[in-house]
Amino acid sequence: MKWTKIIKKIEEQIEAGIYPGASFAYFKDNQWTEVYLGQSDPEHGLDTETGLLYDLASVSKVVGVGTVFTFLWEKGKLDIDRPVTDFLPESDYPDITIRQLLTHATNLDPFIPNRDLLTASELKEAMFHLNRRNQPAFLYSDVHFLLLGFILERIFNQDLDVILQEQVWKPWKMKETQFGPVELAVPTVRGVDAGMVHDPKARLLGRHAGSAGLFSTVKDLQIFLEHYLADGFARDLSQNFSPLDDKERSLAWNLEGDWLDHTGYTGTFIMWNRQNQEAAIFLSNRTYEKDERAQWIVDRNQVMDLIRKEE
């Protein structure tokens, strides 16, 4: 059975030290099944259990900004082919559209010199004047969603945390989703204070960061994915929105057939299939002992492939 194979794979990866523990939930036949494996905090000997708050890293992109843009697009309130400069006139991007940002299809070079020495306002300013690569091509980058967050702040004339709270989390009763830092959370790195945002740009920009920095729980993400499986706003998302010929993307989501997914650096991913009415949530702190990103992508994809498999 699919469930058994997935759990066996996760247990093998914990045993191999890929991550110390994981919270996993799978939705099928209109119900969630959950499992909590390994340890959430090896230093203090704490087992993974229900109710834990995780640093979502880039999964924040869909739990926040991506959902608000999808609302605006679906209601006909926003033409996603409008240029960035309509909203951020001080930026150098009259030729880049919101669609390109949402699908990571620009020619922006995300490299910012001396990034770690900049203040929040200097970092924001630097993102308005990035260098360019030769031509637009798929390059997954946090700068796209940081710019999208700034655009939402202009559209709503509010701070991003207020926008996300009022547009998404409050109406959907997601009471445990919030910007970090938070007091109690699963530690992402041994010896670093739990609850601190792992992503450097998001840590600096705080509640204005559209790319990372959110913390959430299995319970809240279940609510979130159920809305994507059932609500009208998400019915047309399993199509390609990218202007590029060689990479299909939905609005904010990665697209693999009927499956949409988003992953996060700290060892997180969520995925859903509206056609099959299936969804999955995987939360871990794979950066706790080591940061072997290339190997993690291989291991993560093994779990995701098992979830996508037809029974």
Residue ranges: model-predicted function:
Residues 3-54, 77:
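Short, conserved catalytic-motif segment at the N-terminal edge
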Residues 266-279:
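Short, surface-exposed beta-strand/loop micro-motifs that present aromatic residues
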Residues 79-94, 171:
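Short, glycine/proline-biased beta-turn/loop segments that scaffold the active-site neighborhood
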Residues 246, 290-311:
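Short, gly/Ser/Thr-rich active-site loops of penicillin-recognizing serine hydrolases
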